[in-house]
Each structure stands twice: as C-alpha cells, then as structure tokens.
C-alpha cells in the first residue's frame, strides 16, 4: 500500500505523521462537501444494525456473536484496549448498551488487518452484553457497484463518540481487499461494511490520504475469513 493510504484508527496517527498523511485526513472542503450528501448521525442506536456497533478508544467494532466483536488488528493491539472499556452502541441521544471490559484478543494469523475481541458478559453497570446488542449476519458475498454503508465512530473523542453512518459504492474487490467510496475518517477503523440488507461484507481498515470520500479500503470477508471468525465466536 502506498504513502497515500492510511490507517483509519486514531491510535495509528503518530506512526503515519512521518509519512506526511495525517494532516490530509481532515479540513478538506471538497471532501466535506461530498460527505454532507451521504453521512448522517445516528442519534438512537438501540435497534439493528446500529446496536451491533461498538466503540473502542480510537476505533470501531461490530458484534458477530456471543461476547464476540470483530475489529482491526491495529485497534486490538492498542495499548489502551485493556484499560479502556468497550462501549456498546453509544450514541448522542439514545440509551447505550453498557461498557464492557476486554477478556482476550485473537488475531487473524494472515496479513489481513483482522482480529477478534472477546468481552466480559456483564458491564460495569450490571448490563448483559448479549441482551443489549444484536449479532450482525454475514453476507453471502459482494461485487463491484453494490451499494454499501459503514457505521462507526469517526473522530470519536472529538465528537464525544457520536455514531455516524455513511453510504457509498464498492469500486472493486481483489481477494480480501475491498475498495469503496463511502466516506470515512480516523476512528472508523473496524467499522462494519454492510450491504443493502445490513449484512456484513467486511470491515474498514484504511483510506486514501488525498480524499477519503473517494477511496477507502476494507477487509473483505472471504469464506476463509468468515470461517476464522465463526470458529472464534464464544459458544
């Protein structure tokens, strides 16, 4: 991946600054104008698919089964992941699903930026994780020109972890790499990429440093990746 491609997690910005990419992620009027057409805040995240989305410190994840969240390796590797709790479908106005401590992490053994995070079932508020989230179903597949949406927490700390959804189109898929034009920002790492039926196609992991509204990248869930995830869902 070239210098204009950058990881979308706030935890990675220190590394990327040396590549001259970090400043390109914000304050681009032409990008913002495009984003206004296809980005909306989700103020009530208590219903599917929004209640399957969780916030990490500097990233996003999606619930796929009992106590089981899918996100990026670079989010899971964050030094803060065990210190900062996972917040289930936090939004600006809706009732959140609780804050949960991380139990363990399982990284995908291949090069793909994919990891499984297991959380403890009971939140600090005494809520049950599995009763307060929904599990996102996997899509059978996807192809170029399919419409998609991504849901997550762009610039989480700056926006006080408001949830946003953006829509776009798949440009192409090559193996486990998916390129699409849905707008994303730092904090969207690990955001679910959903089809028109709100089925899980993959997760976002990086984007273009020139114009995030034109080119972003996701880990496309091939049968092999889906098998890895399913084998690591808590029973």
Swiss-Prot record:
Impact reported for residue 92 to G: In strain: VBI-M0894
Domain of life: Bacteria
Enzyme class, first EC level, given as a word: hydrolase
Keyword Lipoprotein carried by entry: no
Gene Ontology biological process terms in this record: proteolysis
Main location class: secreted
GO CC terms of this entry: extracellular region
Keywords: Hydrolase, Protease, Secreted, Serine protease, Signal
Its EC number(s): 3.4.21.-
Gene Ontology terms, MF aspect: serine-type endopeptidase activity
Signal sequence extent: 1-35
Keyword Protease: yes
A Pfam family assignment: Trypsin
Active site per UniProt: 74, 113, 189
Entry similarity comment: Belongs to the peptidase S1B family.
The name this protein goes by in its record: Serine protease SplA
Organism of origin: Staphylococcus aureus
Gene that produces this protein: splA
């Amino acid at each position: 991946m070239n210098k204009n491609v950058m990881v979308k997690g706030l935890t990675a910005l220190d590394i990327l600054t040396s590549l001259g990419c970090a400043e390109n992620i914000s304050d681009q009027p032409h990008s913002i104008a495009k984003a206004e057409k296809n980005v909306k805040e989700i103020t009530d995240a208590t219903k599917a698919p929004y209640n399957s989305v969780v916030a990490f410190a500097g990233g996003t994840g999606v619930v796929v089964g009992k106590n089981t969240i899918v996100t990026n390796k670079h989010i899971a590797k964050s030094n803060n992941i065990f210190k900062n709790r996972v917040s289930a479908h936090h939004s600006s106005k809706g009732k959140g699903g609780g804050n949960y401590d991380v139990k363990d992490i399982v990284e995908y053994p291949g090069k793909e930026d994919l990891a499984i995070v297991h959380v403890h079932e009971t939140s600090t508020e005494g809520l049950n994780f599995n009763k307060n989230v929904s599990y996102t179903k996997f899509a059978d597949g996807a192809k170029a020109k399919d419409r998609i949406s991504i849901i997550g927490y762009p610039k989480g700390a700056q926006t006080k972890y408001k949830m946003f959804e953006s829509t776009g189109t798949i440009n192409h898929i090559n193996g486990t790499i998916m390129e699409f034009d849905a707008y994303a920002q730092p904090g969207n790492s690990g955001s679910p990429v959903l089809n028109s039926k709100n089925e899980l196609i993959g997760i976002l992991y990086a984007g273009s440093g020139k114009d995030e509204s034109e080119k972003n990248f996701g880990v496309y869930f091939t049968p092999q990746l889906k098998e890895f995830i399913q084998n690591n869902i808590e029973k």
